[in-house]
Regions:
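Extreme N-terminal, non-catalytic leader segments
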Residues: 1-15
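N-terminal phosphate/diphosphate-binding loop that engages ATP/GTP or pyrophosphate donors
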Residues: 9-12, 26-88, 93-96, 100
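Conserved glycine(s) of the Walker
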Residues: 22-23
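Short internal beta-strands
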Residues: 40-43, 132-135, 160-166
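Short, structured coil segments at secondary-structure junctions
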Residues: 58, 127, 179-182
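Switch II (G3) loop of P-loop NTPases
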Residues: 94-115
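Inter-motif core of Ras-like GTPase G domains
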Residues: 115-138
Length: 211
């Protein structure tokens, strides 16, 4: 189902997830179109990039797809993909694009390693953007989502809310909202394919008009 109230998004935000494959890129595509924002994935591992997919399904112009800071070939955790290529992912090397509206997508979940000392949550904290968490709707999501929220709060990250992706599960959404003390912004279903023709309408359906 969609969201009963329009969501007020900040001009720049970070999209993370409870796991890999939970729908971060899908949500990022909706936001990039709906908010007329630039998309940036600082660390990409895997030959097929999320930016390429996002361009195909949204039709975003090239100037709104910011180049990755680290583009790694192997579809592995960033620290391992970088190790195999002899690359060191360095904290402090990530400069936010100079644009008014920005959607930043993380790799994997918040505890994914970037190098021998740093995790994805270190990058989230360094960039200091409000965070939107994408979670699955299925069994196991309550635990994964609450742990993710806990880690973000321990680092004093500002949490916008949670987007739940998958078959409708009102009980899990209620539990996430209650125990996580967080707003579930929307329930979405990425089984609905995105295209340049429908992405804006799906953003309106799930999130309403942005103030």
């Amino acid at each position: 189902m969609g969201n009963c109230m329009a969501v007020e998004f900040p001009p720049r935000l970070f999209v993370t997830g409870t796991d890999t494959g939970v729908g971060k890129s899908y949500v990022s595509a909706l936001l990039a179109v709906g908010l007329t924002a630039t998309y940036w994935k600082p660390v990409q591992s895997g030959a097929e990039t999320d930016a390429d997919w996002l361009r195909c399904v949204t039709g975003l112009p090239a100037e709104r797809l910011w180049p990755e800071s680290y583009l790694l070939r192997a579809p592995l955790s960033p620290h391992e993909a970088a190790r195999r290529e002899g690359v060191q992912i360095a904290m402090g090397s990530f400069a936010l694009p100079d644009c008014k509206r920005l959607v930043v997508e993380g790799a994997g979940g918040v505890m994914v390693p970037l190098n021998d000392k740093h995790l994805m949550i270190d990058l989230i904290a360094e960039l200091a953007l409000p965070v939107l968490v994408v979670a699955r709707s299925e069994l196991g999501t309550i635990n994964h989502t609450l742990l993710t929220l806990q880690q973000l709060r321990q680092r004093d990250c500002s949490i916008l809310g949670v987007v739940v992706n998958g078959p409708a599960n009102e009980a899990n959404c209620r539990a996430i909202a209650e125990y996580g003390k967080v707003r579930v912004l929307a329930e979405i279903d990425q089984r609905v394919d995105l295209s340049p023709a429908n992405t804006a309408a799906l953003f309106e359906r799930y999130f309403g008009a942005n103030g």
